[in-house]
Amino acid sequence: CLITNCPRG
């Protein structure tokens, strides 16, 4: 996932 699109790190 992207750094700004990670619901759980």
From Swiss-Prot:
This is Locupressin. The keyword Disulfide bond applies. GO terms for molecular function: neurohypophyseal hormone activity. Transmembrane segments: none annotated. Keywords: Amidation, Disulfide bond, Hormone, Neuropeptide, Secreted. One of its GO terms (cellular component) is extracellular region. The lineage of its organism: Eukaryota, Metazoa, Ecdysozoa, Arthropoda, Hexapoda. Belongs to the vasopressin/oxytocin family. GO terms for biological process: neuropeptide signaling pathway. It comes from Locusta migratoria (Migratory locust). Disulfide bonds join 1-6, 1-6. The modification Glycine amide is found at residue 9. It is found in: Secreted. Monomer (F1) and homodimer (F2); disulfide-linked. Its main location: secreted. Diuretic hormone. InterPro entries: Neurohypophysial_hormone_CS (IPR022423).
